[in-house]
């Protein structure tokens, strides 16, 4: 417990919260270029081949980003949009691709939760 005199001299410092997505630098999204597109395996107890990409952002950061949805058209030098949001079973993956913007196409034949995957509404006739 500090004395009154110590508080007068120093004061109390408020704890600053650390950002969970520092590469965005307080922006909602960031643009970047894919430097490598590959698959990786998740932590135990899960098993899959998760699609991820290493992305060089416009601010110079190089981050690993998850490509959500079934199938994608990304390759090296694709220009992509990154948002925050980690993938719990992939260590080091703290960002998501925004589907349906820039070079990233939306998920084909998606009927539900379309806005999350950049899918257009299906025609009424089909």
Curated annotation (Swiss-Prot):
One of its GO terms (molecular function) is structural constituent of ribosome. It comes from the Bacteria. The keyword Protein biosynthesis does not apply. InterPro entries: NA-bd_OB-fold (IPR012340), Ribosomal_uS12 (IPR006032), Ribosomal_uS12_bac (IPR005679). Residues 113-126 have a biased composition (Basic residues). GO terms for biological process: translation. Keywords: Methylation, Ribonucleoprotein, Ribosomal protein, RNA-binding, rRNA-binding, tRNA-binding. Residues 1-27, 103-126 are annotated as: Disordered. Pfam families: Ribosom_S12_S23. The modification 3-methylthioaspartic acid is found at residue 89. GO terms for cellular component: small ribosomal subunit. PANTHER family: 30S RIBOSOMAL PROTEIN S12 FAMILY MEMBER (PTHR11652). Belongs to the universal ribosomal protein uS12 family. Part of the 30S ribosomal subunit. Contacts proteins S8 and S17. May interact with IF1 in the 30S initiation complex. With S4 and S5 plays an important role in translational accuracy. Interacts with and stabilizes bases of the 16S rRNA that are involved in tRNA selection in the A site and with the mRNA backbone. Located at the interface of the 30S and 50S subunits, it traverses the body of the 30S subunit contacting proteins on the other side and probably holding the rRNA structure together. The combined cluster of proteins S8, S12 and S17 appears to hold together the shoulder and platform of the 30S subunit. This is Small ribosomal subunit protein uS12.
